[in-house]
Amino acid sequence: MTSLTQRSSGLVQRRTEASRNAADKERAAGGGGGSGEDEAQSRRDEQDDDDKGDSKETRLTLMEEVLLLGLKDREGYTSFWNDCISSGLRGCMLIELALRGRLQLEACGMRRKSLLTRKVICKSDAPTGDVLLDEALKHVKETQPPETVQNWIELLSGETWNPLKLHYQLRNVRERLAKNLVEKGVLTTEKQNFLLFDMTTHPLTNNNIKQRLIKKVQEAVLDKWVNDPHRMDKRLLALIYLAHASDVLENAFAPLLDEQYDLATKRVRQLLDLDPEVECLKANTNEVLWAVVAAFTK
């Protein structure tokens, strides 16, 4: 409770100081007209980002968030028994690309097709700045005829019996994501000896970022629960679904008290019981998101 109070007071101090600095700059500029208003709005936007605790250095992709939830803090690797996270991370990539305006589903036409039969098409091939995302986007763009969401999850994971399609597999995804997190100051890199071989591991070095991620997931199904997926932030909704599909959501709920844990899992179950075919017809939805959900919950 004390640490929460300290963080809150710290945010207030930063907010007050930022407002004071912005006011001083505006007075020094002498009003400034329209350009001054634009600069003030830009400063407010930057301040909002700081208040959320999401600076450019620590803003994580969906894939990085799911991996971070699955990594053991001290050991620096995911559970050897987790065989779900590989496909889960590929689902994250498709949703991340869709949220960034790069992918969409083909039009459903007069005879409405199901989400799982509609093909994924490239909406924009503009680089994202993320090597893994750009690699996946290149595959989708260059593949004719197009593939469905479920096929892409399997192809990007290398789960295909067709030797002509093995080149679609994205290799060393977890290691590459971990290196991204190292560059962002979240993880570090170590070598550990496992009997007959050495293994590169990535222990947690910035616990604040992981705790903030865990708190965000917990609050989404507890204190900030809205009982309507369309009123939730799409990225957060996708994180809950994909963390569950990757079998790492339990790690975010482990610290909860029994009553909170039961309530959180009950609300996640409510989300899992939704029909993606129905939800994708509602206003302001992302069809790729619901298609990925359908692929994992069918």
UniProtKB/Swiss-Prot annotation:
<dbReference type="GO" id="GO:0009306">
    <property type="term" value="P:protein secretion"/>
</dbReference>
<feature type="compositionally biased region" description="Basic and acidic residues">
    <location>
        <begin position="14"/>
        <end position="28"/>
    </location>
</feature>
<keyword id="KW-0967">Endosome</keyword>
<dbReference type="GO" id="GO:0005758">
    <property type="term" value="C:mitochondrial intermembrane space"/>
</dbReference>
<dbReference type="GO" id="GO:0140312">
    <property type="term" value="F:cargo adaptor activity"/>
</dbReference>
<dbReference type="GO" id="GO:0072752">
    <property type="term" value="P:cellular response to rapamycin"/>
</dbReference>
<keyword id="KW-0333">Golgi apparatus</keyword>
<dbReference type="GO" id="GO:0009101">
    <property type="term" value="P:glycoprotein biosynthetic process"/>
</dbReference>
<keyword id="KW-1003">Cell membrane</keyword>
<feature type="region of interest" description="Disordered">
    <location>
        <begin position="1"/>
        <end position="57"/>
    </location>
</feature>
<protein>
    <recommendedName>
        <fullName>Golgi phosphoprotein 3</fullName>
    </recommendedName>
</protein>
<dbReference type="GO" id="GO:0048194">
    <property type="term" value="P:Golgi vesicle budding"/>
</dbReference>
<feature type="binding site">
    <location>
        <position position="81"/>
    </location>
    <ligand>
        <name>a 1,2-diacyl-sn-glycero-3-phospho-(1D-myo-inositol 4-phosphate)</name>
    </ligand>
</feature>
<dbReference type="GO" id="GO:0005886">
    <property type="term" value="C:plasma membrane"/>
</dbReference>
<comment type="subunit">
    <text>Homodimer. Interacts with the coatomer complex. Interacts with MYO18A; the interaction is direct and may link Golgi membranes to the actin cytoskeleton. Interacts with GCNT1; may control its retention in the Golgi. Interacts with VPS35.</text>
</comment>
<dbReference type="GO" id="GO:0060352">
    <property type="term" value="P:cell adhesion molecule production"/>
</dbReference>
<dbReference type="GO" id="GO:0050901">
    <property type="term" value="P:leukocyte tethering or rolling"/>
</dbReference>
<dbReference type="InterPro" id="IPR008628">
    <property type="entry name" value="GPP34-like"/>
</dbReference>
<dbReference type="GO" id="GO:0005794">
    <property type="term" value="C:Golgi apparatus"/>
</dbReference>
<dbReference type="GO" id="GO:0043066">
    <property type="term" value="P:negative regulation of apoptotic process"/>
</dbReference>
<dbReference type="GO" id="GO:0010467">
    <property type="term" value="P:gene expression"/>
</dbReference>
<feature type="binding site">
    <location>
        <position position="174"/>
    </location>
    <ligand>
        <name>a 1,2-diacyl-sn-glycero-3-phospho-(1D-myo-inositol 4-phosphate)</name>
    </ligand>
</feature>
<dbReference type="GO" id="GO:0045053">
    <property type="term" value="P:protein retention in Golgi apparatus"/>
</dbReference>
<feature type="disulfide bond">
    <location>
        <begin position="84"/>
        <end position="108"/>
    </location>
</feature>
<dbReference type="GO" id="GO:0070273">
    <property type="term" value="F:phosphatidylinositol-4-phosphate binding"/>
</dbReference>
<feature type="binding site">
    <location>
        <position position="171"/>
    </location>
    <ligand>
        <name>a 1,2-diacyl-sn-glycero-3-phospho-(1D-myo-inositol 4-phosphate)</name>
    </ligand>
</feature>
<comment type="similarity">
    <text>Belongs to the GOLPH3/VPS74 family.</text>
</comment>
<comment type="function">
    <text>Phosphatidylinositol-4-phosphate-binding protein that links Golgi membranes to the cytoskeleton and may participate in the tensile force required for vesicle budding from the Golgi. Thereby, may play a role in Golgi membrane trafficking and could indirectly give its flattened shape to the Golgi apparatus. May also bind to the coatomer to regulate Golgi membrane trafficking. May play a role in anterograde transport from the Golgi to the plasma membrane and regulate secretion.</text>
</comment>
<dbReference type="GO" id="GO:0016477">
    <property type="term" value="P:cell migration"/>
</dbReference>
<dbReference type="GO" id="GO:0005768">
    <property type="term" value="C:endosome"/>
</dbReference>
<keyword id="KW-0472">Membrane</keyword>
<keyword id="KW-0446">Lipid-binding</keyword>
<dbReference type="GO" id="GO:0140450">
    <property type="term" value="P:protein targeting to Golgi apparatus"/>
</dbReference>
<keyword id="KW-0653">Protein transport</keyword>
<dbReference type="GO" id="GO:0000139">
    <property type="term" value="C:Golgi membrane"/>
</dbReference>
<dbReference type="GO" id="GO:0030032">
    <property type="term" value="P:lamellipodium assembly"/>
</dbReference>
<keyword id="KW-0597">Phosphoprotein</keyword>
<dbReference type="GO" id="GO:0007030">
    <property type="term" value="P:Golgi organization"/>
</dbReference>
<feature type="compositionally biased region" description="Polar residues">
    <location>
        <begin position="1"/>
        <end position="11"/>
    </location>
</feature>
<feature type="binding site">
    <location>
        <position position="90"/>
    </location>
    <ligand>
        <name>a 1,2-diacyl-sn-glycero-3-phospho-(1D-myo-inositol 4-phosphate)</name>
    </ligand>
</feature>
<dbReference type="GO" id="GO:0005802">
    <property type="term" value="C:trans-Golgi network"/>
</dbReference>
<dbReference type="GO" id="GO:0031985">
    <property type="term" value="C:Golgi cisterna"/>
</dbReference>
